[in-house]
């Protein structure tokens, strides 16, 4: 199990860094971290099939992941976007199948006015949960900022078509419809 100090080194980890860490664990003489090469191969295979995440390979539990998410959220709320960006990128790397990590990354990039990257991050979140209006709606905001009308309309239409009009979704659906109407008039 990775501890807090070990988690800090993962915040700026690249895929190559993660691979090196996995290799280091595989070659370790320490019985607590020794992992058979066969197990590594199985984990990597599961990773590419989407059956596990890097967090599983690193031994990061839900409490640690939630702690990292809270840290990223607090950085974001405090306007520390560079720190939030590092944290959300690490979270997306560690658990690529968790939509809220991609939403956090998208929101951070959007606040940094990196609209294309933000829209891409929102796109990952939308693919993972197409019934959540937030990723597509915020991607549309990014496309509007980029003056990409076609992609903005597509994102807004996905909000209207794919999202159930639940009390929490309705404000996004109503805003999407209103923006689409404004876009038709221009």
Where do the protein language model's features map onto the residues?
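Start-of-helix register in tetratricopeptide repeats
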Residues: 66, 100, 133-134, 168, ...
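TPR/TPR-like (Sel1-like) alpha-helical repeat modules
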Residues: 144-167, 174, 178-181
């Amino acid at each position: 199990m990775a501890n807090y100090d070990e988690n800090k080194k993962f915040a700026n980890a690249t895929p190559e860094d993660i691979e090196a860490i996995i290799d280091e664990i595989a070659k370790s003489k320490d019985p607590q971290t020794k992992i058979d090469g066969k197990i590594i191969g199985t984990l990597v295979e599961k990773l590419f099939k989407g059956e596990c995440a890097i967090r599983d390979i690193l031994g990061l539990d839900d409490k640690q992941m939630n702690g990292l998410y809270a840290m990223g959220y607090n950085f974001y709320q405090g306007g520390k976007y560079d720190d939030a960006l590092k944290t959300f990128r690490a979270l997306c790397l560690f658990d690529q199948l968790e939509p809220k990590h991609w939403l956090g990354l998208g929101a951070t990039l959007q606040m940094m006015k990196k609209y294309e990257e933000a829209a891409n991050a929102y796109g990952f979140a939308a693919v993972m949960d197409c019934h959540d209006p937030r990723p597509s709606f915020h991607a549309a905001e990014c496309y509007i900022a980029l003056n990409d009308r076609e992609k903005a309309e597509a994102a807004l239409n996905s909000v209207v078509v794919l999202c159930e009009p639940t009390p929490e979704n309705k404000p996004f659906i109503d805003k999407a419809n209103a923006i689409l109407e404004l876009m038709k008039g221009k």
